[in-house]
């Protein structure tokens, strides 16, 4: 992003002159208090909104609109109830063309990777909330996007399922080399997932914190001192700009 500004009519800028670069293959988390502009920034990164000034670039090209190089996952899985799991995963392909054998193979590989191979012919109503979120993740990755955008995707899940989904997301994106932008209110989630954490306040990115924890990440590290020092650092950054 280069000097990106976005304003809703009659309001101060929601995104106010942001310069931000994400390295390919990294996991970037975006945190900040409610109303600071996180979701608007995500929509700009997705091409769902166009900035009034500045540019959003993806792989060196100015982003004009959403395309197959982008994957999306939001808080509600929004699966099609009348379609089987495999067809829900293939939906981004079906919107562009008739799925071929390679598309189906890729979809089945994602379901297998996420522990859902035996559910390919089931309907969403037959799945738990966590399983539905895994289907939504597979759907977001089926076109092998360069950038995956997620807005509070696990917020409605219980703590155990949420932790499992965090591990699934990390493992799957690492294996595929996918660049991720993940919006969350949860500092501990951001520290667990992120290579970098951007702190947003009043439409600006006010801090960009590099997280250097040993990998692969496991849930037990949440109880260790280095993890909690990073959590305290992010919290201090958020508290400092809000004071």
Each language-model region and where it sits:
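A short, flexible loop at the N-terminus of ABC-type nucleotide-binding domains that lies
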Residues: 5-17
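The feature captures the beta-strand-to-loop junction immediately N-terminal to the Walker
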Residues: 31-33
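Helix-to-loop junction immediately C-terminal to a conserved catalytic motif
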Residues: 46
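Conserved ABC transporter NBD signature motif
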Residues: 54-66
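Short helical segment in ABC ATPase nucleotide-binding domains corresponding to the A-loop/adjacent helical element
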Residues: 86-94, 104, 210
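Conserved signature/switch motifs of ABC ATPase nucleotide-binding domains
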Residues: 122-125, 143
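Hydrophobic anchor residue at the start of the ABC signature
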Residues: 137
């Amino acid at each position: 992003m280069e000097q990106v500004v976005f304003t809703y009519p009659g309001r101060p800028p929601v995104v106010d002159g942001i310069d931000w670069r994400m390295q390919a293959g990294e996991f970037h988390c975006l945190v900040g208090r409610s109303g600071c502009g996180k979701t608007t920034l995500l929509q700009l990164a997705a091409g769902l909104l166009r900035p009034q000034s500045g540019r959003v670039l993806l792989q060196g090209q100015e982003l004009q609109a959403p395309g197959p190089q982008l994957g999306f996952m939001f808080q509600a899985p929004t699966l099609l109830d009348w379609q089987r799991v495999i067809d829900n995963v293939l939906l981004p392909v079906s919107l562009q063309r008739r799925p071929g054998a390679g598309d189906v193979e890729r979809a089945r590989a994602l379901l297998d990777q996420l522990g859902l191979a035996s559910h390919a012919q089931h309907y969403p109503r037959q799945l738990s909330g966590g399983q539905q979120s895994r289907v939504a993740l597979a759907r977001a990755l089926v076109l092998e996007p360069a950038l995956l955008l997620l807005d509070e995707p696990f917020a409605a899940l219980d703590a155990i399922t949420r932790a499992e989904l965090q591990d699934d997301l990390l493992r799957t994106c690492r294996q595929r080399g996918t660049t991720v932008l993940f919006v969350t209110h949860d500092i501990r989630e951001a520290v667990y997932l992120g290579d970098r954490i951007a702190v947003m306040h009043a439409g600006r990115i006010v801090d960009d914190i590099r997280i250097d924890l040993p990998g692969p990440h496991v849930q037990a590290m949440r109880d260790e001192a280095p993890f909690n020092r990073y959590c305290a650092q992010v919290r201090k950054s958020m508290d400092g700009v809000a004071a």
